[in-house]
């Protein structure tokens, strides 16, 4: 509550100073508002600005309007809008069949959420998902694509917004943001603050999130300089959350709100980011940009890990979970930098563009950990077992656990890359060819591992007619394993992941752009992919082990549609088919998947849609969304059942005021959002929830 009072006090002066501008505020919802509502032609993720129909890469953009209409708070609210993307765990997703966790901010590495917290959207202007072989532009990464979060920047024009939210699960919060020109010529500023607190659906679990964000934009004699600083504070009592145990048919063995954590367990993240970016246009043919980003974060996790299921009464049904207490501290800092040059020129009469760029990333992590295993018998010095049906918490105080001293693990990761991409246009043909050189070095304790690689990409686009194009592309991929994966405690070191990808597709902007669609087919082969060992911490050293597969092949098709059905009715829809399988075994048998089995958490079919209809004369709009995810297999080869979930929004706008009612999981479906391993269970989807957000703009 104190954070809300602070935000309200800070906005008092703003509100009084903005009264003179009220007369300039017009209705937000007007006739024709739906047309182009969710469209964004601009995207940073492609590096080389190109109209969608002229590009052999597919970029899906979730813009501010769609984020606002959905009342989206974090990245998980947006996955339905991107074909081929579904939830895996925490901030990770399945993209074109592969697990993908790394994300970018304004085109740079430096994730403040550290992998166990989901990115929040308060200071995000739009979310871009670059499909396919993004590694040629961004360096090593999963070939299914990558997320780029474009943050909010200062604007010369004054605007401000204040909002308050209340909802089920004891939810309440407030936010405020303001931007405009400062008294210094050529300088604009932005300030923002967000606070929200709520119970989360699992027993003992809560969420408290604070984000403070500020920035300056400075017009220079050559170009524009943006300076930004952001602080994140997430306090998650009753976390870190694992899943709820299931049987092999994917049915929960207990209530979806069951939690393996004690009331005193928690996950706490404090992170700060500073960033500077510069961009300039030199004449008509040369574009330059450069950026640097520094991130530091401290994440503390003290929680009870499910350590094994037991049938204590002999009826053939698991009824108790053994637990391991884990005390972990991750202190991390990293630097990221990148620069690009785009030169437009004629080469022997051929319209040409050349992109040259380089990037660099270094990360240091100090990981302190300790833990103690519980047993089936109640012990005064170790975690007690927890019933799945009648859990009793607090039997043994954590303060009485016999914990060993902390084990300290120091890792340092360095990445560097340079790339060239050449584009040539001859009539209706547009061809691209590019190469990238990558090098990396990981140091973990006394062990060191380094390597490099040269990878290639080529693409071709043919403009069948002004509103239709077909394209194809080929790319190689190269992805070093994470530094923490190289530790012998996890079974490392491991060789890098390598792969090859082919993609072809069609793009269109029919009916004067009112009907925009795309279709793609792809084939991806990757080797030496790491996956969690279902046996968990094999050596009892406090670190879960990993295993490497031989070869994984992913084949699929994707369809995306954005349509202005009428002047007041808009629809976005996506469908994806994927077949990801283990096509060559590396000889290890610890994982139950065998050659030909489906890969973990890779659904065969996914469907998502979001549709919005407005009543301009009433200032009212209603929206409905749906998300279908097909059957999957967990990492322990347990079934993860398919689900269909609906969400809805009602938006009422009157002058500068806006009210949003958001209903998640409209039918209160009980489902698993994804699978993990059998001892930790499947991640349950959230039950039905409702919130009201009231906001005012100046």
Tell where the protein language model's regions lie, with residue ranges:
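Face-selective signature of the C-terminal outer-membrane beta-barrel domain
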Residues: 274-297, 324-446
